[in-house]
Structures are given as C-alpha cells and as structure tokens.
C-alpha cells in the first residue's frame, strides 16, 4: 500500500513483574521513533495501538522484541494517509484488557488458537457456538455471519452474560473473536475456568482475518470498529465511512450525520437527549478549539480519541 502511516495494533499476555520500570524506557523509545498512540502495561502484559512511519514502527517493534519476553509479541498492521493519533502515552494498569474477574490468567491457560485460514471451517460447523466478545456499538457495525451478540456495553459484563446464558454441559464447542485477539484470548481463559471444555478463539482477531483471508471468501458482514480516528475499517483494511461522536463515542454513519440531532463534536442521535448541560457545554467549547486549530492548520491534541480495546 502507498499510505505513509503504519497503524500497528499489538499485545501479548506475559508476566511483566517490572512493568512499572518498563514505562519510561518504552515511552522514550516511542518518542525517539516519533510513534504516536497509547500502550498499556500491566503485570499481565502489554496492549495498545500505535502509529508512525514504517521506520518508526519497525524501531519500536525491534526495541520490544529485544526483550526475550516480547520476542513473539502479536501485532497487526494497516495503513492510512494521516496520523490517527496526536499523543504518545504509556499507561500503567491492573489489566491490559479489563474483565474484572480475579484469578483469570491467560498466561496460565487459554483456549485453542485458530488461524484465520481455518476460521471459516470452524464457524461453519453447526455444533459450534460463535460469540462476539466485543461491545454492542462495535457489533452493530459489523460481525461474522451467525455470531451471537452479547449486547454488552463493556467487557466487564461478559462474565455475567456467559453465566446467565450458557451451560458448559450443553455448549460443548465455543468459538470467540474480537478486534485484535486480546479480548477473546482473555475470555477463553475465563471460560475454561468456568468448565467449558472446547474453547476456540480467532488468532490475531478480526484484523488478522481481514489481512489473510481473501474478501471473496470472507464470512464477515459490515465494517470493523477500530480504536483510533479512522473509526472503522473495511475488509481490505481501508478506512470506512463512519465518524465518531465525540460526546458519547458512538460510531455514526452518513444517515445519522444527516439527523437534526447531530451536531459535530457535540451530540448525535444516540446521545442528544441524554447529555447533561455540563457535558454539552464542554463539548461545544472543545469543538470550537478543534475548528480553530483546523483553521490554523495545527494538530489538535484533544480532537481525537483513543481507547485500548476494552
């Protein structure tokens, strides 16, 4: 591809006892390589999405892989014409993806990884229960044909959804997927602990499936939400047509942008009647700053939103 900016989603579950000490050298490496975005560090591993030039991303990956614990860190790439991030951050967390269930440790037990080339065959098996582990607003944009939508607002709700709806003695084969592989990997560890026997998850997530499976063979329907300013990507990993409401963070399509309830940066049909006056005023002020920065051809550091896959 000819686009100048490389967007790299990366993660690995691995015990990092020194994760606090890793923060500063990791941040310095990102800054030295002019890499933008946010990486999360916790005792259970590393997670995040970053962007930069080819040389910059390669420099960061080389530094990470110089640590024997991260030599095989999982990463997926896509491309765009402009920087999707304006800030460079390394944050310390309790979990690199928040499930909120003590004792769930993907470093000790996870389900069976399924390569993208084998995924279609698995999910076409009528005995396989296919679960989308992502949040409701992500599923609404696109998902695999036949997948169950848990309708969760956060990953923290996933355990209760499983307990309320599925029985290990009845549901013998379970396959799960997520954007980059991290949520479904942690979900598989949780489900094994709950007694589910045959648990599968898509290695590298939806993004790796897009990367490796030809579009004409795809069982995916729609776009895929991504955690940067592109908002969504298509199967060919090109930027989708969605924008994102900066007030409620909900993806919005062309029809929703045409709504009388849509005001750029302030509200959309999903939130216009639920915003507090304080939030609305803050959004209006923020949008004015963004527009002023654009008029001056300057980047606006709070004009874009990043959140690690959660």
From Swiss-Prot:
Q: Which SUPFAM superfamilies match?
A: Rhodanese/Cell cycle control phosphatase
Per the record, the GO terms for biological process are: tRNA modification
InterPro entries for the chain:
Rhodanese-like_dom (IPR001763), Rhodanese-like_dom_sf (IPR036873), TrhO (IPR020936), TRHO_N (IPR040503)
Q: Give the reactions, separated by semicolons, that this protein catalyses.
A: uridine(34) in tRNA + AH2 + O2 = 5-hydroxyuridine(34) in tRNA + A + H2O
Query: What GO molecular-function term can you cite, just one?
Result: oxidoreductase activity, acting on paired donors, with incorporation or reduction of molecular oxygen
| Active site feature | 178 (cysteine persulfide intermediate)
Q: What does this protein do?
A: Catalyzes oxygen-dependent 5-hydroxyuridine (ho5U) modification at position 34 in tRNAs.
Query: Which residues belong to any copy of the Rhodanese domain?
Result: 124-218
Among the Pfam families in the record, one is Rhodanese
Q: Does the keyword Nuclease apply?
A: no
Q: Which UniProt keywords apply?
A: Oxidoreductase, tRNA processing
Could you tell me which CDD domains the record lists for this protein?
RHOD_YceA
Q: What is the E.C. number?
A: 1.14.-.-
Q: Please state which protein family the record places this protein in.
A: Belongs to the TrhO family.
Matching entries from NCBIfam families are given as: PRK00142.1-4
This one is known as: tRNA uridine(34) hydroxylase
């Amino acid at each position: 591809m000819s686009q100048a900016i490389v967007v790299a989603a990366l993660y690995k579950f691995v015990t990092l006892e020194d994760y606090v000490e890793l923060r500063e050298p990791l941040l310095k490496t990102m800054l030295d390589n002019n890499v933008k975005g946010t990486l999360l560090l916790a005792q259970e591993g590393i997670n995040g999405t970053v962007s930069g030039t080819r040389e910059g991303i390669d420099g960061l990956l080389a530094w990470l892989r110089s640590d024997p614990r991260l030599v095989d860190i999982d990463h997926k790439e896509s491309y765009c014409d402009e920087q999707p991030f304006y800030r460079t951050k390394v944050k310390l967390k309790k979990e690199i993806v928040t499930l909120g269930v003590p004792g769930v440790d993907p470093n000790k037990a996870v389900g069976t990884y399924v390569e993208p080339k084998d995924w279609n065959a698995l999910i076409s098996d009528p005995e396989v229960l296919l679960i989308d582990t992502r949040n409701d607003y992500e599923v609404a944009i696109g998902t695999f044909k036949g997948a169950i939508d848990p309708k969760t607002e956060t990953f923290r709700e996933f355990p209760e959804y499983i307990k309320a709806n599925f029985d290990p003695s009845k549901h013998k084969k379970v396959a799960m997927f997520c954007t980059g592989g991290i949520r479904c990997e942690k979900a598989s560890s949780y489900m094994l602990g709950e007694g589910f026997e045959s648990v599968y998850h898509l290695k590298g997530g939806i993004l790796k499936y897009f990367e490796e499976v030809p579009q004409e063979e795809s069982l995916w329907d729609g776009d895929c939400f991504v955690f940067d300013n592109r908002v969504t990507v298509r199967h060919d990993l090109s930027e989708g047509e969605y924008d994102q409401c900066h007030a409620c963070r909900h993806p919005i399509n062309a029809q929703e942008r045409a709504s009388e309830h849509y005001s750029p940066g302030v509200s959309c049909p999903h939130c216009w009647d639920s915003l507090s006056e304080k939030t609305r005023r803050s959004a209006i002020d923020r949008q004015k700053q963004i527009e002023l920065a654009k008029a001056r051809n300057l980047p606006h550091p709070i004009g874009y939103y990043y959140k690690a896959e959660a």
